Regions:
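Accessory beta->alpha helical hairpin/"wing" motif in late/C-terminal subdomains of nucleic-acid enzymes
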Residues: 87-91
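Intrinsically disordered, low-complexity serine/threonine- and proline-rich regulatory segments
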Residues: 1-18, 98
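Amphipathic alpha-helical dimerization/coiled-coil segments
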Residues: 93-120
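N-terminal helix-turn-helix DNA-binding core of bacterial DNA-binding proteins
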Residues: 11-55
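Basic amphipathic alpha-helical segments that dock to polyanions
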Residues: 56-63
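Beta-hairpin "wing" of winged helix-turn-helix
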Residues: 64-81, 86
Length: 120
């Protein structure tokens, strides 16, 4: 497959889909296998976001092709082989850019008094 180029970190990217965001979020803390990514997405979203294996692995394949994540050496858990994944340098930049975009939206909403500020 042809690898799609990721824009430079300084360029604006469209908002990430929830599946992409939560996969990158889960991998920001370190290498994980697919099931651990699914569980982490559910945990960090407070149960608001769940994804099935079809969505997970289709999205993982796309992120691999884009170079946002990398497959690491396969781990062996009790004779079961699992593929593990980690963020690439580009993936870290894209995840950080998305967090900055979200933070900017929250600040804008607070300035417009659409949501309360922290602690008040």
């Amino acid at each position: 497959m042809v690898k799609t180029e990721i824009p430079d970190a300084g360029r604006k990217l469209p908002p990430l889909s929830p599946a992409v965001f939560y996969i990158l979020f889960a991998l920001a803390e370190g290498e994980k296998h697919g099931y651990a990514i699914m569980k982490e997405a559910e945990t960090v979203s407070g149960g608001q976001f769940t994804m099935g294996p079809g969505t997970l692995y289709t999205t993982i394949q796309r992120l691999l092709e884009l170079g946002l994540i990398e497959e690491t050496s396969t781990s062996s858990d009790s004779e079961r082989r699992r593929r593990c994944y980690r963020l690439s340098g580009s993936g870290s930049q894209v995840f950080e850019a998305e967090l900055n975009r979200m933070e900017s939206l929250v600040r804008s909403a607070q300035r417009r008094k659409l949501v309360p500020r922290d602690g008040g």
